[in-house]
Structure formats: C-alpha cells, structure tokens
Amino acid sequence: MTNFCIKSYLFLYLSFLLFFDIITIFHVSSIRISTVLKNDKKKKNFNTSLVEENKKYLFNEIKLNNRFKNDIKGYIQNINNFHSIIESKIPNSLLYVHEDLINFHNSQFIGDIEIGNPPQSFKVVFDTGSSNFAIPSTKCVKGGCTLHNKFDAKKSRTFMSNLKNKKESIYTYVQYGTGKSILEHGYDDVYMKGLKINKQCIGLIIEESMHPFSDLPFDGIVGLGFSDPDNSFQTKYSKSLIETIKEQNLLQQNIFSFYVPKELEKSGAITFGRANSKYAIEGEKIEWFPVISMYFWEINLLGILLPDKNFEICSNKKCRAAVDTGSSLITGPSSLMQPLIENINLEKDCSNISSLPIISFVLKNVEGKTVILDFTPDDYILQENSEEDNSSQCVIGLMSLDIPPPRGPIFIFGNVFIRKYYTIFDNDHKLVGVVKSNHNF
C-alpha cells in the first residue's frame, strides 16, 4: 500500500487532475497563421480549425514487422536477447543515460534538461502520453509561465527559429481540460546528463492561462510519445524527442525505462538506452506487449476481472490502454470504470483492506498469449496518514475519466500501474515491456 500524509494525498489528487489536463491526450492542431495571433477573430478561426482537425482522426493501428510473422518464437528470443539488459550488466561501450527524478508527493516525477548554447536549465516531466516538447519562452510575460524558468532564444548561439518571414510563423494552439497555451516552434540542442540531441524541435510557450500552470512544480513537458500520425506538420518538422534520438543514432538501443517508487523519500528514475536490473525483481520475466496505435504507447486490453466477485469488463468489446508516465492513477471510461469502483467496497478508515479483491488486468502479449497482471489492494489503495491524530484514510487509485474521440475512449495506466510494474518502452520494435518492480534497495 502506498502511504501519504493527509495533506500530501489531497495534493496528489488535485495535482493529478491538473496534470492530466496538461497532457496532450487531446488533439493538438498546428496551422500557419499571421503573427497577429492576439486578434480575437484570428483566435476564433484558429479554434474552429482545431475542431475540424479533430474530425479527421482515424484509429491508426500498426502491426508487427512482417519479417517476424512466420517466426514469432525467433522474434521473442531475439527481443529477449536484445533486452538482456535486465539479466546482465550492460557493456561499458553501450551508450545510455540515467536520471533520478524528483518525487513530488508520489504524483509527479521531475527531471532536469538543458537547452541551447550556453545551456539553459529546466525542470520537466517526461511524459509518454504526449509527443510535445514544451518550455516557457521569455516572450511569455503573463499568465502561468511567469513563475517558471523561461528559455531565452536570443541567448542561445544554436537556436534556429521556424519563422519563414517577418509576418508568418507556425504556431500551435493547445486546449486542455482547464487551460490553454500557444506555442511557437524552433530548433535547438538538448542535453540530458551528457547526451546531446542536435536540433530538437521545441515548442516555446508564448502565452498560457494562469490555471493550472502557475501551480505546477515544473517548467515544461518533454513528450516521449510518437508524433501525431494525422498531423503533417508534426510528422515532417516536429519529431518527438525519442524519434530524434533514434534518427540521430544516439543510442545503441532505442528504449527507455521508467521506475515509480512506493515511498515518498525515494526518487523515481528514467533511463534512456537500457533498463536497470536494480528496479526489477530478480528472476521475474519481462512480458512484452505490441503497441497497437501510433497515437500513444497503447496496448490491447482484453479484460479487467474481480475474480472473487464474478465480475469482468471488456470481455465483449475491444478495450485499449495507454501506458502513461504523466498520469497518477489508473483511469478508464466511466461506463466501464464506475461499475468496477463500485464493486470495491473500501472503508475510508482502511479497516477492510485485507478483504478487498485482487484486480486482474488481462492483456495479450507479443506472442498472442494471454497475460494476467494482478493488483492486490496494497497496489491500488492509496493510504493517507494523519500526523496529528495518527489516524488513516484510504482511497482507491482508480478513477473514471472519459477521453473524447478520436483519442478515446481509452484506459490510462498511470503511475499506480507503473509503480507495480517497472516499464520498458521499446521504440525499435514498438513494444511495451513490464516486469514486477523491486522496491527493496
């Protein structure tokens, strides 16, 4: 069970709602517009274009590489050898970067990056639920960005603007659940613990709402998802960080792994180029699941079971789940998630935790075999401890959340999921690997 003090959990819940709003789970539209963007009429037309773009979305399913179709066992052996990183040490010649992440109330995990020459430092969230790289610009003089570090393009010798002429540039308008921002785009070098990524496309925030951004404990977002397949600007000019890393052959293995701790005093971790056996229970098998959509790190979800209650969902319909390092909880469509939550009769004083059911997520692995991932009450119940009277309160780490089409409906496997299963994201083979997390170190 994950423990929080009373004030911590209250913040966890609120910050989750705020942070999920800033994840680009909703469509982001890029169009070329005049630089006089602040004109109300222009903004109205811009929003209309955003809605029209949404209508064009089609579910984009991808398949395993054809060369593996007739030799899936060989493929699995190949991929497991390829990821022998879990079972053995990486040779010194392998290039990888590791970063410990600041644990902010067990709800957000914050890392460091540098941009430009000379480098300018920023606190960011690494977010697999987004492909956008967004950092406040010095051009942003009001709203939520005023309290954060801001990138000064004029001070970087390596910055390149996408400005075509004095009157025209490409902007991105992002509408979130409770806020909005406007970004212009440029290119500069990015540094992560010694790894240099050349000419990465960066979204520079030039305007954003006060709420929720002013309250967030980080400066920006580094999206680790895929470029929007339906957005021609993104796929051609605005590649995500992991796509740029792969394109520039910076890592021998185009994978990254994410660890979420149980304890508040422990750091989270992200590693590019390998997984770390420190974070996996020794002897546990990695289960690999094929990515089924280029919108997210999205995998097939065959069902969710409560074995002791003869309860199941998703068995008669196609469900899908996005593994998202930027979300705190496990969420799903209200029509499916609410019956599940109602069947978990948790007492708020935590008195009946031992009698609560195991929740089982049924998935299909890369071999086409059924895999069941079990979550005990200790995994999905969040406990609040009061420092004043030594009492406890408990809440369920599951929540109903309706993501509108075309991105939804979809389940989100956030940090409650990743805390139980150390997660590996394979951008070479478009796979998600999970293995039981080791928290005893």
Swiss-Prot record:
SUPFAM superfamilies in the record: Acid proteases (SSF50630)
Superkingdom as given in the UniProt entry: Eukaryota
Similarity section: Belongs to the peptidase A1 family.
Molecular function, one GO term: aspartic-type endopeptidase activity
Record: active site: 127, 324
EC number(s) per entry: 3.4.23.-
Topology term for the membrane: Single-pass type II membrane protein
Extracellular side: 29-441
Upper classification of the organism: Eukaryota, Sar, Alveolata, Apicomplexa, Aconoidasida
Record's protein name: Plasmepsin VI
Keyword Protease: yes
Function description: During the development in the mosquito midgut, plays a role in sporozoite egress from oocysts.
Observed phenotype of the null mutant: In the mosquito midgut, number of oocysts is normal. However, oocyst appears immature, enlarged, degenerated or vacuolated, and fails to sporulate resulting in a lack of sporozoites.
PROSITE patterns: ASP_PROTEASE (PS00141), PEPTIDASE_A1 (PS51767)
